Design a protein with these regions (language model features):
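Extreme N-terminal, non-catalytic leader segments
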Residues: 131-197
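Non-catalytic signal-transmission and effector/linker regions of two-component phosphorelay proteins
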Residues: 1-12
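Cofactor-cradling patches in redox/metallo enzymes
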Residues: 21, 28-133
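Conserved glycine(s) of the Walker
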Residues: 208
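A conserved segment at the C-terminal end of the G1
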Residues: 211-227, 231
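Conserved small/polar residues in nucleotide/adenosyl-binding loops
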Residues: 240
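Hydrophobic anchor at the beta1->P-loop junction of P-loop NTPases
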Residues: 199-201
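The conserved Walker
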Residues: 20, 205
Length: 240
């Protein structure tokens, strides 16, 4: 049965991963491709990822949502810890979605969603909604613009060590540059006071961009322990 894909109205970023001590990555690999095909940017971390890794990535990317699979039996603690970490790190706006087939029992799904997890999809959901239907539900719930509350005063509070503040300003410029021209001008003015070299690395998929960047950064930091370097990555498949 053909279903009409939900089309997001905003730029939606979703961090995907399989849980810690979990090598079952087939499901999340399918899900992430469908999420991407529904119009979202996907940051995929792979399998065997800790709650801390997932949450830190979501904050650094200023993501709208986290989508996880958990088939190793520790889902109750794992999902709740991610929920708690997001609030501990002052990022409660990031939504949490997950699934684990028959491993997550109906009463556990109920408990997790009452705890605050936005949605745990069950095998029954898969049968009733279909794969695209579940992803449409996830994307629709995550369809909001990030960076809306950032103002000029926030630019003065940017710290190199604070990835969250940097990510939020990037989101604000990406999503609200027309509505907030003063924000863009303030950033341009601030940039005038710095003489920092900028190196761009580009190439087709599989050309070795990440490997080259990794090697350059490693050598730079080994030779300059007191220096700092920032890396901004852009999805090469982006249409913009």
């Amino acid at each position: 049965m053909e279903t009409q894909k939900y089309q997001p109205n905003n730029k939606v970023r979703v961090v995907t991963a399989a849980s810690l001590f979990d090598g079952h990555d087939a499901a999340i690999n399918i899900m992430r491709r469908v999420i991407q095909g529904t119009g979202c940017e996907v940051i995929h971390l792979g399998h065997d990822k800790s709650a801390e890794e997932v949450v830190n990535c979501a904050i650094q990317e200023d993501a709208n949502a986290i989508a996880l699979t958990s088939y190793q039996g520790g889902h109750n603690e794992y999902f709740k810890y991610i929920y708690d970490l997001l609030r501990e790190k002052n990022s409660p706006q990031i939504k949490i979605f997950g699934g684990g087939g028959g491993v997550i029992l109906p009463e556990e799904i109920k408990d997790l969603m009452e705890y605050g997890i936005d949605r745990i999809y069950s095998p029954d959901d898969g049968r009733e909604m279909g794969l695209q239907g579940m992803i449409d539900d996830l994307v629709q719930k995550s369809d909001f613009a990030t960076g809306e509350n950032i103002t000029v005063s926030d630019i003065e509070n940017i710290k190199f060590e604070d990835a969250k503040s940097i990510a939020q300003v990037i989101s604000a410029v990406e999503n609200f540059s027309d509505e907030k021209p003063e924000l863009v001008e303030a950033l341009k003015e601030k940039a005038k006071h710095f003489n920092i070299p900028i190196i761009g690395i580009t190439g087709t998929g599989g050309a070795g961009k990440s490997s080259l960047t990794d090697e350059l950064v490693r050598r730079f930091l080994r030779a300059n322990a007191d220096k700092k370097i920032a890396i901004i990555s852009v999805d090469p498949r982006s249409e913009e």
